[in-house]
């Protein structure tokens, strides 16, 4: 997972499937940082993700709750059709690409 903070948005680009080990990093390292730094906007780029397990879904929900605590927004972008089916119940806004995230949040 690669992180970049730009224009008030934390871009998280996953470079592999979101499984137990990635979920652990999200829950134990990333979410506390989101809360302590009061990060309000996150874009999750799913371009290189082929699969997500239950631990991954839970981690995304935990991240969504952290962002809501900060009165922010979270978006998924570049989501494959296969992943859209798995992610439909977590109710995170899906947009086509990172530029659309910037437009949605109003950063440009």
Please annotate each region the language model reported.
Residues 1-50, 62-108:
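STAS-like cytosolic regulatory interaction modules
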